[in-house]
Amino acid sequence: MSNETKCPFNHTAGSGTTNKDWWPNQLNLNVLHRHSALSDPMDPDFDYAEAFKKLDLAAVKQDLHALMTTSQDWWPADFGHYGGLFVRMAWHSAGTYRTADGRGGAGGGQQRFAPLNSWPDNVSLDKARRLLWPIKQKYGRNISWADLLILTGNVALESMGFKTFGYAGGRVDTWEPDDVYWGSEKIWLELSGGPNSRYTGKRELESPLAAVQMGLIYVNPEGPDGNPDPVAAAHDIRETFARMAMNDEETVALIAGGHTFGKTHGAGPASNVGPEPEAAGLEEQGLGWKSTFGTGKGKDTITSGLEVTWTSTPTKWSNDFFKHLFSYEWELTKSPAGAHQWVAKDADEVIPDAYDASKKHRPTMLTTDLSLRFDPAYEKISRRFYENPAEFADAFARAWFKLTHRDMGPRSRYLGPEVPAEHLLWQDPIPAVDHPLIDDADVAALKAKVLATGLSVSQLVSTAWASAATFRGSDKRGGANGARIRLAPQKDWEVNQPAALAAVLEALEGVQKAFNDAQTGGKKVSLADLIVLAGAAGVEQAAKNAGIAITVPFAPGRMDASQEETDVDAMAVLEPLADGFRNYLKHPYKTPAEALLVDKAQLLTLTAPEMTVLVGGLRVLGANVGDSKHGVFTDRPGTLSNDFFANLLDMRTEWKPVSAANDVFEGRDRATGAVKWTGTRVDLIFGSHSQLRALAEVYGSADAQEKFVRDFVAAWNKVMNLDRFDLA
C-alpha cells in the first residue's frame, strides 16, 4: 500500500466536484455573503475612519516621496524614479470601475486579490505593491491598502512636478475577492471573434463590461484585437472610457497626462515570462511573471510587450506628449517582443534610455495614443490642450481626481486634509442640513398626517422603496437622501410609474408644506425624510393590519437636492432595468430574472435572508410595478403577513408555466384545477431553489408571523438608510 493511500487526508473540505460542476446554471447566492465579519481580521469595534483621522498624512507622503527615487536592486526604477510605475498602479486600481453597475474601482483595494492581481494588464504591479509594503507595514491599520494605492499615485504625480486636484481617504479594505462579472471568456486576452465574445453586431460591447478583452483595464494598446488602426481604436477608447464616466475631454486628458510619465516594457518575447501570481509557486510569495529574459528586470523587463517612452522628460510633467504627437509623422513598427507600436519618422533621438544615460531613442507611441490625433473629436481637444498647457494641466488634475474617487460615493465619505473644497456635479451633491430636525413627537404627528391623506399602504411603501432602492453598495451612489425621485430622470423612469408617483409626491409635498409653514423656530422636514417616513407609516399600518404593533426606526437628516445639483446623464445609469423586489423587468433578458434579483440584492448589500423576507413582504404590501398580481399570494393585500411563503409552499397548489419563455406561471388547486395564483420566476425561485426554500420555510411556518414582521422591518430599515453615511 502506497503512502498516499495510507494518508487519511487525500482530499480536503472544499475540494472535489462541486455543486456548480454538477449544476452550472444553479442560482448562485454566494455573492450575497461576501465581505462578512467572518473574513475580516479587524476587531469588531474597529472604525477605519477614526483610524485614518489619526494618521499623519504628511509623514506618509514624505515616506512616499523618498520611495520614489530609492531604486531597489530586486526591481530597479525606470529612469531612477518609480513615478511612472506607481501612476499606472493607481490608475489600474481605480480603472476597473464601470458605471453600469458601479462595480470595480479602487474602493476595497481589490487589486491585491484574484483575478485582478493576475490580469495580463496588471503585469509588474505585484512589484509596485511589494515596494509599498514597508510603508504599509509602518502605518498599519491607519491607512488601508485601498487608500495607499491611490495616495501613492498622487504622490508620484506630485514628485514629478504635477499639481494634483486633491486627495480623499476613506476607502475601507476588503479581505477577499469581489464576485464580479468580468466577462465569459475562458482565455486571457481572447479576441472578439472567440466563442464567448463580449461583442455582438458591429462591435457592440456587452453590458456591464467596460474593457475590450478579458484581463484588460480598458483597451488593447495595439488597437482592436491587435489591429494597429488608430481610428478604429478611437471607437474602443470612447466606448470604454464612457463606461467609466469619462467624456471625450476627460479621456484625452487622462491618456495624455498619464502617458507623460514613465514607459512601457517589451524587452523580449512574452514566452520568457512565467506564470501570474495566482499560478506561481509558493516560493514566489505572491509575486508572478518571473522572467528568464536577461536579468528579468530593469532594461530586460517584459510587461505589456510594448517598448514605448512617450516624452523626453519621463519623470517630469511637461507638454511633450502633445508636442511629439503633432510634430512627427509616424510609421508602424514592432517592439522587441513583436508588438505593434509606432516610431517617429526622420526624428532625432531625443528620448532618454531608462537605464543607460549615454543612450537616446526616437519618440514612440502606441496605436491608442495616435487615436488622439487621428480621431477628429479627439484631435480637436488634443490641439487645444497642446496650445494651452495650463488648461491641459487643469483638465488632467480634475480627470485624475474623478478617476481615483469616482467609486467613493458622496463627499461625506471623504477624509483628510487634502479634500478639495470645490463641490463637483459627478459627486451627486446634496445640501448640508441647515435647519433644526424633526423630533419624535413630530415623527408621530407626520405619520398620522400621511395616513390621513388616504394614500394606500401600497403607494407609501412603493414610493419609499423606489426612492431608497436606487442605492448601489458598489459605488455608494443612489439612495433616498436628496429625494431625487422627484427630479429628472428618476421621476420619469418606467419602473417608478410616473403618473402614480406624481400623485403620491403631490400629497406628500402638501403634508410637508403644512408642517413647515406651521413651524416658528425654523424646524423643517425635507421631502427626502418625509418619503422614508411615509414608507415607515405604511409598513407600521400593514403590520397593525396583521395584528402586530411595531415601530419602524427613523432617523431624520436627509436633505433635498435640486435639479441643478443632478447630472441627468450620470444619474440615468441608476435606472433599474430589473427589480425583482417589485417584480419588474424592463425588457426580456438572457440572464434569468432570479439571477437579476440576486444581483440587485447584492448591490443593496443584502444577505439571502434579508432578500427573502423583503420579497415576501413587498409582495403582500402590493409593491409590484403596474399593480401586477404576480406573486401576490394573499387575499389580504396591504397586510404585512407571511402569506407569500405559506401559500407558495402549500402542496395543494400545482405550478405550471404559461408563457413561452417560462417566465410566468399559474398555481392551480390540485383538487379542482382552479387558478389560485400567478407568479414569475422571481416568485417561484423561493420554492424551487433549495437554499431559498429553506429560508422560505422559516417564514412560512405557523409560528413565524411575528418574526417575519420583525425581520422585514429590520431589512426595510437597512435599505432606507443605506446612503446615510452620517449615521455610520
Swiss-Prot record:
Its cofactor is heme b. Keywords: Heme, Hydrogen peroxide, Iron, Metal-binding, Oxidoreductase, Peroxidase. PROSITE patterns: PEROXIDASE_1, PEROXIDASE_2, PEROXIDASE_4. InterPro entries: Catalase_peroxidase, Haem_peroxidase, Haem_peroxidase_sf, Peroxidases_AS, Peroxidases_heam-ligand_BS. GO terms for molecular function: catalase activity; heme binding; metal ion binding. Heme b binds at H259. CDD domains: catalase_peroxidase_1, catalase_peroxidase_2. One of its GO terms (cellular component) is cytosol. The active site is at H92. The record marks R88 as: Transition state stabilizer. Belongs to the peroxidase family. Peroxidase/catalase subfamily. This is Catalase-peroxidase 1. It comes from Burkholderia cenocepacia (strain ATCC BAA-245 / DSM 16553 / LMG 16656 / NCTC 13227 / J2315 / CF5610). The gene is katG1.
